[in-house]
């Protein structure tokens, strides 16, 4: 028996999306966002779907592809300090179940949004640009790449 040792991850960011119930909670949070936006009077259904998609993708971009480091004091001696949450997830292994889920979710939301906006040109362009802004950083070829030095430090 090891007294005084903890059984935890070196970096908790690596396994947070593999926790029990996190996928269901994520989908329910998107649904709750949509219901809250639907409750705003005088806002049409297509606008609500577009807002749901844009807010979701903006949050995903900020939390997964912009914020770097960990909110915890980790014993990894700063290895995760320069990595985004997406790069830390599953220890950087590509094509895991969590990464696939987080890649497919904005695509499904995009299809739903396109359908409910009846493929209106303005909504379609906004939603497509939003989708590309969260899908392109997820590509394995862009792992650790900082385009034009943005978010380098």
UniProtKB/Swiss-Prot annotation:
Annotated TM spans: 22-42, 43-63, 95-117, 122-142
One of the GO biological process terms: ceramide metabolic process
UniProt keyword annotations, A-Z: Endoplasmic reticulum, Hydroxylation, Membrane, Transmembrane, Transmembrane helix, Ubl conjugation
Topological relation to the membrane, as annotated: Multi-pass membrane protein
Role according to the record: Plays an essential role in the homeostatic regulation of sphingolipid de novo biosynthesis by modulating the activity of the serine palmitoyltransferase (SPT) in response to ceramide levels. When complexed to SPT, the binding of ceramides to its N-terminus stabilizes a conformation that block SPT substrate entry, hence preventing SPT catalytic activity. Through this mechanism, maintains ceramide levels at sufficient concentrations for the production of complex sphingolipids, but which prevents the accumulation of ceramides to levels that trigger apoptosis.
Family: Belongs to the ORM family.
Name of the protein: ORM1-like protein 3
Originating species: Pongo abelii (Sumatran orangutan)
């Amino acid at each position: 028996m090891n007294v005084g040792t903890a059984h935890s991850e070196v970096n908790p960011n690596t396994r947070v999306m593999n926790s029990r119930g996190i996928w269901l909670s994520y989908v329910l949070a998107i649904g709750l966002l949509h219901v809250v936006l639907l409750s705003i009077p005088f806002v049409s259904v297509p606008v609500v779907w577009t807002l749901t998609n844009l807010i979701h993708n903006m949050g995903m971009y900020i939390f997964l592809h912009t914020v770097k480091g960990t909110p915890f004091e980790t014993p990894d001696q700063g290895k995760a300090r320069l990595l985004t949450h997406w790069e830390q997830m599953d220890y950087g292994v590509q094509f895991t179940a969590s990464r696939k889920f987080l890649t497919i979710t904005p695509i499904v939301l995009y299809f739903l949004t396109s359908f409910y906006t009846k493929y209106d040109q303005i909504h379609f362009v906004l939603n497509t640009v939003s989708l590309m802004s969260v899908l392109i950083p997820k590509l394995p070829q862009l792992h650790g790449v900082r385009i034009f030095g943005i978010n380098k430090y």
